[in-house]
Amino acid sequence: MEDTVKITAEELKGYIERIEKLEQEKRDVQDHIRDVYAKATDEGWDIKVMKQIIRLRKMDDDDREEQEILLDTYKRALGMSYEEELSE
């Protein structure tokens, strides 16, 4: 029984250490991402728009198209459509 507990404890410790290592790697990657955003900001890029583009690129094509159609529908309903401004 004691051997089983020892093996289980070692296995648990291994999982914990792997998770801790991955958490550190995740923090490092997040730091790198912040650096890229900072550099883009310094060069005049709009970070909010970049983040929106990244979010859209993660979506599958059908979901993205559906969201864009809904957004356009809502904007037109509120008189915010660019096309409506052009036709006036």
Curated annotation (Swiss-Prot):
Domain of life: Bacteria
One example GO MF annotation: DNA binding
A Pfam family of this chain: GapR_DNA-bd
Family: Belongs to the UPF0335 family.
Protein name per the record: UPF0335 protein WRi_003770
Organism: Wolbachia sp. subsp. Drosophila simulans (strain wRi)
Organism lineage: Bacteria, Pseudomonadati, Pseudomonadota, Alphaproteobacteria, Rickettsiales
